Amino acid sequence: MNMLYFVLALLVGLAGGFFVGQARGRQQRATLDDQLQREARAEAERIRTQADAEARQLREQAEQRLQDAARRLQEADDRERQVTLQLEAQREQLQAVRAQIEAERARAAQDAARERETLSADRQETRREREELKREIERLNRRAEQLDARGDKLDALEERLEGQLHALAQQEAELAERSRQVDLKLYEVAGLTPEAAREQILRQLDAELEEEKAIRVKAMTERATAEARRTARNVIAQAIQRSASETSSQMSVSVVPIPNDAMKGRLIGREGRNIRAFEALTGVDLIIDDTPEAVILSSFNPVRREVARHVLEALVADGRIHPTRIEEMVHKAQDEMKSFIHAQGEEAAIESGVVGLKPGLVQLLGRMYFRSSYGQNVLKHSVQVAHLTGIMADELGLDAALARRAGLMHDIGKSIDREIEGTHVEIGINLAKRFGEPPEVIDAIAHHHDPENGETLYSVLVAAADAISAARPGARREELEAYVRRLEQLEQIAIAFPGVQQAYAIQAGREVRVLVQPEKVTDAQATLLAREIAGRIEQDMEYPGQVQVTVVRESRAVEVAR
């Protein structure tokens, strides 16, 4: 029992100790927890305080950075506004300078156009004066030759008359006595003085001699003309029937089509750089106006204009239009043009049957492809002249190859007459001498406009072929005003002669038909009148080919039967 109490007491003691230990442990733990919590709160407060301080410091740094950024942004805005103002001022200044440059360019273009017009007018005036002087010299040369021929005839006549003077001297005494008796008889019969009777007889004799002279001149002229015309017709007919060529010539075009009007802006380029580069590289004015789907190329040099046309067509087809591309296309087109010109010269030489030409002459021949005279292509004209000259030379038994060479080369000076001072004849002579052409070719070049002064027959053949090729209908064109003025001048020259009733220019100015008053002009005098009118036309006018003068004298007798 005691044991039980002891055990119970022990258990109670153990239980009490356990509970007491537990209570004390809880108290200690509570105390420790409170201490830990206070330390944790203190540490948290310290961390919070330190974090707040760091946050304030970071906030202040951020605010400082924001202020710095705002200040820098403000400074950048200020600088941007300042630069914008400067750019605006510079842009306005550039626009003003550009406007001034455009105005100066327009003035310069106008001045250049006026200068070109003045130079063209001066050149035409100089050329006209030179042609007039040349015609005057030719007329004086013909007059001198006529006087020389007349002097020879007079010398022969003088020799013949000297032989007759001796016989006439013997008859002089008899004639004097007979004349005295005739005068006395006339005085007795007609009641006239010897002086009056002599004057009447002389007037009658002059009229008879004038009539006889006109009849003889007419007969001799008709006989010589018929013979020469028969021979010339035979030779020329043989040449013409073996030659054929087109009647219209190809003209150099200066209008280039474009696909649409938007292409005009691309051709001009930004601030006009494309058109400036194009004009500077080609030497051709590019005119862009309101013409729909087309632009115009303007230049006095046909070769440069043709190069510019090829360049422009290539640029439009390619679509890449800028100064570098323009320069590439110009160089390419120039090389192609040189090859094309040389090929044209070789083709003309082969077509004409002329061999052995030097490359320089072939190149000059090719340049004539772009040269025209009164609308007629000079190269095709030269080829046709070569054919005609060769055919006529063959008919006359001359060297046909040399004749073709002279015909092909007769206008070689026209290939560069717009670049070198002088007439195409002078330039052609110098070129032929430089390239070592035969003397016959040089003589044909020098005298294909005045064959009567030539030293060989080839100059006459070339002049005839030149006239045939140039004067045939449709070969050349001329201005309407000049054509009408030429017809009026032909009629006025004919009407100015006494005895002319009316005159008409027909067949495009190649014939003048003159109606005369039959009571004032006899049949014999009509021949002399036609010759005088033709001489006046040759002296006072310029005309292609020949002008035929036809004098018509018509006598009518009217009576009424009643």
Curated annotation (Swiss-Prot):
Q: List the transmembrane segments.
A: 1-21
Please name the top-level EC class of this enzyme: hydrolase
Entry-linked PROSITE patterns: HD, KH_TYPE_1
Under the heading SMART domains, the entry gives: HDc, KH
The record's keywords, sorted A to Z, are: Cell membrane, Endonuclease, Hydrolase, Membrane, Nuclease, RNA-binding, Transmembrane, Transmembrane helix
Q: Does the keyword RNA-binding apply?
A: yes
Q: Name one GO molecular function term.
A: RNA binding
Does the record carry Manganese as a key word? no
Per UniProt, residues of the KH domain are 252-312
Its cellular-component GO annotations read: plasma membrane
Stretches assigned to the HD domain: 378-471
Outline the segment boundaries, as ranges, of region: Disordered. 108-129
| Major site of localization recorded for this protein | membrane
* Membrane topology, record value: Single-pass membrane protein
Note the CDD domains from the entry.
HDc, KH-I_RNaseY
Q: Where found, per UniProt? A: Cell membrane
UniProt GO BP: mRNA catabolic process
Q: Tell me which family the UniProt entry assigns to this protein.
A: Belongs to the RNase Y family.
Instruction: Outline what the protein does.
Output: Endoribonuclease that initiates mRNA decay.
In its UniProt entry, what is this protein called?
Ribonuclease Y
Q: Which gene encodes it?
A: rny
